[in-house]
Amino acid sequence: MKVLILACLVALALAREQEELNVVGETVESLSSSEESITHINKKIEKFQSEEQQQTEDELQDKIHPFAQAQSLVYPFTGPIPNSLPQNILPLTQTPVVVPPFLQPEIMGVPKVKETMVPKHKEMPFPKYPVEPFTESQSLTLTDVEKLHLPLPLVQSWMHQPPQPLPPTVMFPPQSVLSLSQPKVLPVPQKAVPQRDMPIQAFLLYQEPVLGPVRGPFPILV
């Protein structure tokens, strides 16, 4: 009986050990499966991160790519452009373009500026001097004839002639009235040379004109 009990106990102990081994194996398997699942999850996370990073890089490349294409269209050739013309051909000379003066408004404005800056010189008309008519009271006396220092035969011939009216004499204003800006040169009068048997009318024509209010030569009173 004791032997049977011992054998049962040994069998139970072995069964327990077997169960424990099974449990340990199961736990090991579960741990290994959990480790595999963890690694698989980690791989999925890494893959997702790599895909997200790749997507962002692709978006950046898509944004940069059209700008690079536009630059490549504007500057298609990076190297120097070869000259197709031969070196012995001279360049064409450019003839200067001559613009006529009537097309330039600045040139047309120069004469107007000159006209405004330098006014035109206006000539003043010669003033008309008053003419006094000859009256009978204007006559020479014997004392005036003596002052002329004329020869005696000429004076005697004048004495026997009747008095005649003389042409009107021109009255000149004093020199202060004349304009200083435009001086007028008067002709130099020629002195009369008395001749023998010369009438008084011809002699008076050669007399010098008297300036100022002094009256001209007068006829001789007989």
From Swiss-Prot:
<feature type="modified residue" description="Phosphoserine">
    <location>
        <position position="30"/>
    </location>
</feature>
<dbReference type="Pfam" id="PF00363">
    <property type="entry name" value="Casein"/>
</dbReference>
<protein>
    <recommendedName>
        <fullName>Beta-casein</fullName>
    </recommendedName>
</protein>
<keyword id="KW-0494">Milk protein</keyword>
<dbReference type="InterPro" id="IPR001588">
    <property type="entry name" value="Casein"/>
</dbReference>
<dbReference type="InterPro" id="IPR016345">
    <property type="entry name" value="Casein_beta"/>
</dbReference>
<keyword id="KW-0964">Secreted</keyword>
<keyword id="KW-0732">Signal</keyword>
<feature type="modified residue" description="Phosphoserine">
    <location>
        <position position="33"/>
    </location>
</feature>
<feature type="modified residue" description="Phosphoserine">
    <location>
        <position position="32"/>
    </location>
</feature>
<keyword id="KW-0597">Phosphoprotein</keyword>
<comment type="similarity">
    <text>Belongs to the beta-casein family.</text>
</comment>
<feature type="modified residue" description="Phosphoserine">
    <location>
        <position position="34"/>
    </location>
</feature>
<dbReference type="GO" id="GO:0005615">
    <property type="term" value="C:extracellular space"/>
</dbReference>
<feature type="signal peptide">
    <location>
        <begin position="1"/>
        <end position="15"/>
    </location>
</feature>
<feature type="modified residue" description="Phosphothreonine">
    <location>
        <position position="27"/>
    </location>
</feature>
<dbReference type="InterPro" id="IPR031305">
    <property type="entry name" value="Casein_CS"/>
</dbReference>
<comment type="function">
    <text>Important role in determination of the surface properties of the casein micelles.</text>
</comment>
